[in-house]
Amino acid sequence: MKMLTRLQVLMLALFSKGFLVSLGDHNFMRREIKIEGDLVLGGLFPINEKGTGTEECGRINEDRGIQRLEAMLFAIDEINKDNYLLPGVKLGVHILDTCSRDTYALEQSLEFVRASLTKVDEAEYMCPDGSYAIQENIPLLIAGVIGGSYSSVSIQVANLLRLFQIPQISYASTSAKLSDKSRYDYFARTVPPDFYQAKAMAEILRYFNWTYVSTVASEGDYGETGIEAFEQEARLRNICIATAEKVGRSNIRKSYDSVIRELLQKPNARVVVLFMRSDDSRELIAAASRVNASFTWVASDGWGAQESIVKGSEHVAYGAITLELASHPVRQFDRYFQSLNPYNNHRNPWFRDFWEQKFQCSLQNKRNHRQICDKHLAIDSSNYEQESKIMFVVNAVYAMAHALHKMQRTLCPNTTKLCDAMKILDGKKLYKDYLLKINFTAPFNPNKGADSIVKFDTYGDGMGRYNVFNFQHIGGKYSYLKVGHWAETLYLDVDSIHWSRNSVPTSQCSDPCAPNEMKNMQPGDVCCWICIPCEPYEYLVDEFTCMDCGPGQWPTADLSGCYNLPEDYIRWEDAWAIGPVTIACLGFMCTCIVITVFIKHNNTPLVKASGRELCYILLFGVSLSYCMTFFFIAKPSPVICALRRLGLGTSFAICYSALLTKTNCIARIFDGVKNGAQRPKFISPSSQVFICLGLILVQIVMVSVWLILETPGTRRYTLPEKRETVILKCNVKDSSMLISLTYDVVLVILCTVYAFKTRKCPENFNEAKFIGFTMYTTCIIWLAFLPIFYVTSSDYRVQTTTMCISVSLSGFVVLGCLFAPKVHIVLFQPQKNVVTHRLHLNRFSVSGTATTYSQSSASTYVPTVCNGREVLDSTTSSL
């Protein structure tokens, strides 16, 4: 036992300088409250604020000091009057002042362990007669301690009390460090740890999209661990810290001024997060007021809803968002506290100082130029508001009482008094078996729901619930208004919040990007970015990435995705369609008229002399070429695309095969005349038809093979420079379409060559001249068409219209050059549509529909020249 005592004294000496002197100095004076009882609870409260300079203690802390102290006394009185809670057991108290300093609090707390040391050592002091020595000034044996307030105080005290297994319950310490049961294994609290509060503060910032903020913390466990927890929560929500400042323990004005200057260096960080003790918060707000700095403050419960913090600096604090632990006012305490005055409250040695400070008067003769206090002064609703943590102080006292009650019922089942088993408390058993397992309804709570339950989790922590306040100016006065709450999730009544500039402030490193812009993040910083516009055809995958929708798609209005663009093609009602269709219809009508005239006058000399069979084939090809306009204007489909590919080349092949057959026939006839050869072969009508069909068949075979190798279909085509337009086209390249006309080009060239060769035929064969003119004009049309076709490839409307008009013009050239003169004679010069002469050649003659053989003739003739050879013109012109 002696070894144990010395070990304890040694460990205490490590914690407090001058402890042994204090322990043995009976003249050591301190202010304290001592009320004897069967069981005594210690109490630690910041009755005085921190002193400045060499002073340990400063002014009286009216709210957090005096009110909380009286709350403990009030709770002890109520428990001692309770017939169900610890009946027959009187609770006493031993209350000390911490002066808001951890080192001072530790020195004061040594008084709590004196009884433990004295109790251990008293067996060593015996009188000669064998009786124990009577000791003076015996310290009270402490069953448990209520306090402290600041986390730094509780940490220091907890390190001491654990050595003597004295349970401790704090009513205000929220540092996350205190949840570490390996270090603070006799500590509990009726408030939650700060990481809940840090989470709530981060969610408030995220709610208002404040992503770039500054922070200020008080030096010590409360501020440092609290702001560390906040920074972790902020990172999870992509909130950046512009500057992180810390206020030391010196409490010097210039240090607060320096912090304000640093905050002003970050103009984009309009929101400042405070995790500070109340006195530090007050000094910082005062420093901001001195330079008229305007910030939106988001403060922890160190600020809470205290009027004293903003007094004199209300205009700077206006619009602040503050958090306070969710609590309800204890109305019974209001009545108790308002009944106190210096004349009836003799057990509180600090109450007279509190009274003089509150009413700015003196209870004795005039001091400090103050007047004598009026005896009618009283605490009432006009000068008093219950401090926010009174409920937690009361709950802490009741929690200790409930634990002692359960322990007394277990160890002393046969009496309501303390039995020998509880004369010396087992602090470890009290803490682990009873205190951590308490579960009761909070006293004086008007609400009887789940929120009124007092209990501890496995770490000895209270439940995490917070109220959100807004500092406002209403009705000519400043006050705090509750605007929300947090209990795992955040609720805010945004409409009730007042802002310093009448609108929700912004606090961002960079301005928000426009809906069509992405954020280009700066290296190593998730809150600063450059806004880069997305391309018109891109959508936003997220706020950092623009993604190409791909060909044929376009982003939605909100850029959240893409949709398929409507297919664009020439419609029948478009101006681009009306023109070509009108021309094609006109050409088709003209063709029908020619066919009708030819059929009606099918047996006339002129029609016979024109080669009826080839003319009808030629007219069919012309009709088909006009029909191609309708195929090119129609909406592309596999069938339409097949008809386009088949019809375009085939229509030309029909026309030019007929013309080639005719010019070839004429050329062979007159070559035979020139050379004196036998009658040429295959110049009969049936032979010419078969030759023509053979030439057409070549084209049909080529196109058929092409259709087999490249199956007709459609495709959605988008020009790189016109991504917003999707053109529905046939799945064939423009070059392939023109290549398919290669055979037709060969036919055109051959026709042109033969037409040129037969250009000097006699007048009755001057149809060759008209064929030549037709071919020359056709070549000019197509030579003009090809450049236009390729140049306008970017505009399918112009390209299609050009194609249709060129095809129609080719038909008009054939009608105008070859058939118009014939129709004119048939209809308007019928006198020329008769047989008056016969053509006599040396060895050939042409009559009717063909050239016939003749041995000789005596008819007269008019000499003319065909290919340098004289021939006879003895019939009408064959036009």
Swiss-Prot record:
Location relative to the cell: Cell membrane
PANTHER family documented for this protein: METABOTROPIC GLUTAMATE RECEPTOR (PTHR24060)
Signal sequence, renumbered to the chain: 1-22
Gene that specifies this protein: Grm3
UniProt GO cellular component terms: astrocyte projection; axon; dendritic spine; glutamatergic synapse; neuron projection; plasma membrane; postsynaptic density; postsynaptic membrane
Cystine crosslinks: 57-99, 240-527, 361-373, 412-419, 509-528, 513-531, 534-546, 549-562
Intervals, Cytoplasmic compartment: 600-613, 665-688, 757-769, 829-879
Entry's family note: Belongs to the G-protein coupled receptor 3 family.
Functional note: G-protein coupled receptor for glutamate. Ligand binding causes a conformation change that triggers signaling via guanine nucleotide-binding proteins (G proteins) and modulates the activity of down-stream effectors. Signaling inhibits adenylate cyclase activity.
Name this polypeptide is given: Metabotropic glutamate receptor 3
A Pfam family that the UniProt record links to this protein: NCD3G
Membrane-spanning parts: 577-599, 614-634, 646-664, 689-709, 735-756, 770-792, 803-828
Primary location recorded for the protein, binned into one broad class: membrane
Membrane topology reported for the UniProt record: Multi-pass membrane protein
Keywords: Cell membrane, Disulfide bond, G-protein coupled receptor, Glycoprotein, Membrane, Receptor, Signal, Transducer, Transmembrane, Transmembrane helix
Quaternary structure and interacting proteins, as annotated: Interacts with TAMALIN.
Positions with a binding annotation for L-glutamate: 151, 172-174, 222, 301, 389
